[in-house]
């Protein structure tokens, strides 16, 4: 059990028959009445975000999430196959479970699979990934007004805004949290 006064971003808790990750929290001490903690939580099973208020000092159960290093192997219809690097055990995850992460996954990529009491919750991506540009408009020389960008389609189908000097075939570093261009690889 952990006190809500000890909340921090990224903490995983078990509340109301669900597993929740703390995205944001704020301790509120009104002039009149008892203090409370206002929090923004993401359900690890469904991905939905919810705001919840706790009384100050209230205790909640801390959920111990296990992260296993795995390698993304291939897509098989509507499911995607991952392999544990140590035991060579393979697991399949449905497209709905990893819908957002699919835009960044390449074959043989190392990821972290989050599990809770044997149940697979989802995929945790690295902060950045390297993806190749498959389609973009050619850059025009002399068109160097400040911060000019153009859309580029990457090898996974993800479309990001990139500077005009980026050409097809180049490899880019993409931030997985925001889905934005960082730099050339």
Curated annotation (Swiss-Prot):
The keyword Cytoplasm applies. SMART domains: EFP, Elong-fact-P_C. It is found in: Cytoplasm. This is Elongation factor P. One of its GO terms (cellular component) is cytoplasm. One of its GO terms (molecular function) is translation elongation factor activity. Pathway: Protein biosynthesis; polypeptide chain elongation. Keywords: Cytoplasm, Elongation factor, Protein biosynthesis. Belongs to the elongation factor P family. Involved in peptide bond synthesis. Stimulates efficient translation and peptide-bond synthesis on native or reconstituted 70S ribosomes in vitro. Probably functions indirectly by altering the affinity of the ribosome for aminoacyl-tRNA, thus increasing their reactivity as acceptors for peptidyl transferase. The keyword Methyltransferase does not apply. SUPFAM superfamilies: Nucleic acid-binding proteins, Translation proteins SH3-like domain. GO terms for biological process: peptide biosynthetic process. PROSITE patterns: EFP. HAMAP family: EF_P. It comes from Bacillus cereus (strain AH187). It comes from the Bacteria. The gene is efp.
